[in-house]
Amino acid sequence: MSLFDHSVSELHTLLQKKEVSISDLVDESYRRIGEVEEKVQAFLTLNEEQARAKAKELDDQLAKGEETNPLFGLPIGIKDNIVTKGLRTTCAIKILYNFDPIYDATVMERLNAAGAITIGKLNMDEFAMGSSTENSGFQLTRNPWDLKRVPGGSSGGSAAAVAAGEVPFALGSDTGGSIRQPAAFCGVVGLKPTYGRVSRFGLVAFASSLDQIGPITRTVEDNAYLLQAIAGVDPMDSTSANVPVPNYVEALTGDIKGLKIAVPNEYLGEGVDEGVRQSVLAALAVLEKLGATWEEVSLPHSKYALATYYLLASSEASANLARFDGVRYGYRTDNAKNLIDMYKLTRSEGFGAEVKRRIMLGTFALSSGYYDAYYKKAQKVRTLIKRDFENVFERYDVIIGPTTPTPAFKIGEKTSDPLTMYANDILTIPVNLAGVPAISVPCGFVDGLPVGLQIIGKHFDESTVYRVAHAFEQATDYHKQKPVL
């Protein structure tokens, strides 16, 4: 039995009783990485020397009997688009291959203050643009459940590392499903918080009105502990919300009697794998037995979500990525004859194909002749999508459906057709456009591959999302299943 089969609260108890040391936990993480990393390839950069030094320092504090919190001394993996002072941050793209940040993201400051230990930085799609982690500029991460399949994306390294037992939990980011989709593919728990619940300061921006940092864990309770540590208003991020952060762990009562669930008919219709559909219906039956009721509803503008998202996200990416020019940091071409040449060649050599595709799409949507027809119209449709959610939430507590239309697909299966790749996020994207919280929890298997159940909540009501997810988790054992590597 691995130490990481224990929950956060169990590990905390073991540390308090001195049955294990923090150094033991760090050793276990690097031991497991040494055992499976060649197969999974989740990490881009390891932080071994600093992690072991911090473990020794925290062990000394523990020996003195100092008061500690639940995350104290626990190893964590960090998606490589969250800046870490003194630890290389690449966003999995060539143009930032040597970027060494001089400050920590706010979430890193909060994790460090809580005593968490950064094990390393995790692979992803370049600048978080992708649904399979195949767009990484450095390596291909594989799904621990089937090494011939993708782990999902863009937080594929984070989900794969947790599923493979390399770390007990990890941070990811979610712009259109990039936490929830890989969590579903890898059979772990992933939450996208409400937009503004977690500071984005220090998150390398893809689409600023959609991006949100969130936790990927083995269990719902662990997820709640991690969100508790990173949530809250931040003066360094003007979009972070000054909304009180409740005690998420206290919300895990297991009681969902009288809960009203909405199930959008758009989420179980055409394009959803039959095995996935049956897994979700079985999950709803479990929730019914626990005292909840569910009804079918409609989110009529969902069919426009994919087009709306790719216009808005690509437009924001076009603006955000203009700063990567080879002047101040990162890669700079050696082949330039003049300044303009340097800009062009640095970006063409430093960006991958998917990043270039989205910059082109965004620049086109923002151009003077097409701004009203594309970008402005997409913003109007986004408002309609948000209203759909608001209307449903007037009558129901949560919305439930599958996280993804299918289980994990094979490596290389969708790379030649970007539209089929984009369509894999069709059930997660509306949540980002509306800015509401959503979690993916394991709810079954299709041909030995995990299936995710998506539970969507009202703005800043992560507590109810967690309560429902935890009640379902405790009534099933899908979260206890582990891949064999």
Swiss-Prot record:
Subunit-structure text: Heterotrimer of A, B and C subunits.
Active site residues per record: 79 (charge relay system), 154 (charge relay system), 178 (acyl-ester intermediate)
EC numbers: 6.3.5.7
Classification via Gene3D superfamilies: Amidase signature (AS) domain
Organism: Geobacillus stearothermophilus (Bacillus stearothermophilus)
Name by which UniProt lists this protein: Glutamyl-tRNA(Gln) amidotransferase subunit A
The UniProt record lists the keyword Nucleus: no
One GO CC annotation: glutamyl-tRNA(Gln) amidotransferase complex
Gene name in the database record: gatA
